[in-house]
């Protein structure tokens, strides 16, 4: 049984009501419930955290190593374009991760085109709405099966 951690960055607690034309109408609670169910059905354990505070996400990444987390799925949200500290935390713990974005960041403002995570992530999923989280989970579980 693997343990997976899903991290949601700033403002994702507002999903379902925040700019639904961009981010969809699915709530964060619905996303988390779906991922928990899918992981459980596959025989795995899924943890999740949403925070608007960079340091809380960093602390959670550090704790993940001590807890034996096998894979991280992260939507860094606005921290994607600004947080060297989150990038360094992910590199420090050496836990593979997939970067997820609900919107297609490449169709948005130019400042959103740069990610501090993409070049060190196992993969990046963007623009598929809440489905992107499900696809990230499926990919993570598949990768954990590999020798």
From Swiss-Prot:
Entry protein name: 3-dehydroquinate dehydratase 1
Question: Can you tell me which residues the record assigns to a coiled coil?
Answer: none
Q: Name one GO molecular function term.
A: 3-dehydroquinate dehydratase activity
What species does this protein belong to? Pseudomonas aeruginosa (strain ATCC 15692 / DSM 22644 / CIP 104116 / JCM 14847 / LMG 12228 / 1C / PRS 101 / PAO1)
- UniProt enzyme class: lyase
The UniProt subunit note reads as follows:
Homododecamer.
- Sites marked Transition state stabilizer: 18
Q: Name one Pfam family in it.
A: DHquinase_II
Active-site residues from the entry = 23, 101
Q: Does the keyword Lyase apply?
A: yes
Q: Where does substrate bind?
A: 75, 81, 88, 102-103, 112
Q: What does this protein do?
A: Catalyzes a trans-dehydration via an enolate intermediate.
The organism's taxonomy opens as:
Bacteria, Pseudomonadati, Pseudomonadota, Gammaproteobacteria, Pseudomonadales
């Amino acid at each position: 049984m693997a343990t997976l951690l899903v991290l949601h960055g700033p403002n994702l607690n507002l999903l379902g009501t925040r700019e639904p034309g961009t981010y969809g109408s699915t709530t964060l609670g619905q996303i988390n419930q779906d991922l928990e169910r899918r992981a459980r059905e596959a025989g795995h354990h899924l943890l999740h955290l949403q925070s608007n505070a960079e340091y809380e996400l960093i602390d959670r990444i550090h704790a993940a190593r001590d807890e034996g987390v096998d894979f991280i799925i992260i939507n860094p949200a606005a921290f994607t374009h600004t947080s060297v500290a989150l990038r360094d935390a992910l590199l420090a713990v050496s836990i593979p991760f997939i970067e997820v974005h609900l919107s297609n960041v490449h169709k948005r403002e130019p400042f959103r085109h740069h990610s501090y995570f993409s070049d060190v992530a196992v993969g990046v999923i963007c623009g598929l709405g809440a489905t992107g989280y499900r696809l990230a989970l499926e990919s993570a579980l598949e990768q954990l099966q590999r020798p």
